Regions:
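ABC transporter nucleotide-binding domains
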Residues: 2-4, 9-188, 193-207, 213
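Short, flexible turn/loop "capping" segments at secondary-structure junctions
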Residues: 52, 220-222, 247
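ABC-family P-loop ATPase nucleotide-binding domain
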Residues: 1-8, 294-333
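Short, charged/small-residue-rich alpha-helical element at the C-terminal edge
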Residues: 225-294, 299
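Conserved beta-strand-loop-alpha-helix hinge in the C-terminal portion
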Residues: 210-230
Length: 333
């Protein structure tokens, strides 16, 4: 679906993206993770032909970008940072105008498709209000709706949960999983590690413009070679395991072992009652922080995906049951 080969982008003497090669397969939920300023947005813009690469090759849906972008853009839904909209028009009218401008737009189905897109992102019931009264989170939902008006094969999203509160983030995550299960390939960029971990099946990590990691989430969160064991007789267990115990906390042990079943059998044979046994797995946080050397705050770990409300924000009028309170924001006349 997306392939880049040694893509580099320079702005003057600054390399924003350096020799990046990614591979997004059909059916993926691919998360491009990196701290702010790592080159994520620049790469996303290059995928859509909005920014030209200095060198390298980009293929999207089998076509070279930007040369043949017009062939594939009708099959791509995209949300790039804060979406643009006419502030004096309603969200519904903005979507209708956007759809009408598309080269393959079908007028007779437009109303139904707009209704469905608004419903899916939680804006039904407030879609006739002027966009200038929308909060940041509501504008983000509208931008996602614009990417769904014409059913896409591929969604390319840059920070799609920007401005959303925790409930809004969960709603959008559930929507993206549902779309993916219906056959839509998802590519998104984010600096929020918890959200990428909760949503994506494969990830790439950008650091200072370079791709430092690309792997499936399952492989990254594989076994560590350690087993957590809760037993009734820690002294006998320690003696039985003969140097394999790395840590003891009361009746709980951390044991070096690649074979939990054999470990359990060995303890039982020695007369140690095993209350619980669990394979210790690496967290995505540990892996990403190891390869980037960044602090956890650079990836939204401390905030766990929360988003602050705009300064001075006040909730708009009632009538938006699908949008959570912190997501509704201000009416900026």
């Amino acid at each position: 679906m997306i392939t880049t080969r040694n893509v580099t982008k320079r702005f003057g003497h600054v390399e924003a993206v350096r020799s990046v090669s990614i591979d997004v397969r059909e059916g993926d939920r691919y998360g491009l993770l990196g701290p702010n300023g790592s080159g994520k947005s620049t790469l996303v813009r290059m995928l859509l032909g909005l920014v030209y690469a200095t060198s390298g090759e980009i293929l999207v849906l089998g076509e070279r970008i930007p040369r043949h972008a017009s062939r594939v853009l009708p099959e791509i839904g995209a949300l790039i940072e804060e979406p643009a909209a006419y502030p004096h028009l309603s969200g519904r009218t903005n979507l209708r105008l956007l759809d009408a401008a598309g080269p393959n737009s079908v007028r007779r189905t437009r109303r139904l498709r707009v209704d469905e897109a608004l419903e899916r992102v939680g804006l039904a019931g407030i879609d006739r209000r002027p966009v200038r009264t929308y909060s940041l989170g509501m504008r983000q939902r509208l931008g996602l709706a614009s990417a769904l008006v014409r059913p896409p094969r591929l969604l390319i999203l840059d920070e799609p949960t920007n401005g959303l509160d925790p409930r809004g983030i969960r709603d959008i995550r559930d929507l993206l999983v549902s779309l993916n299960e219906s056959g839509v390939t998802i590519f998104l960029s984010s600096h929020l590690l918890p959200e990428v971990s909760a949503l994506c099946t494969r990830i790439g990590v950008l650091d200072s413009g370079q791709l430092v990691l690309q792997e499936s989430l399952a492989a990254l969160q594989g076994p560590t070679g350690r087993v957590l064991v809760s037993i009734d007789d820690p002294e006998r267990a320690v003696a039985t395991l003969d140097g394999q115990v790395e840590h003891r906390d009361g009746q709980d042990l951390v044991v070096r072992s690649s074979d939990p079943a054999a470990l359990n059998a060995r303890l039982v044979k020695a007369g140690v009652r095993v209350h619980a046994l669990a394979v210790q797995r690496r967290s995505l946080e540990e892996v990403v922080l190891d390869v980037t050397g960044s602090g956890s705050d650079q990836f939204g770990v401390a905030a766990a995906g929360t988003a602050a409300a705009p300064p001075g924000a006040a909730p708009p009028a009632d009538g938006a049951p699908a949008v959570s309170a912190n997501d509704q924001g201000t009416a900026d006349e």
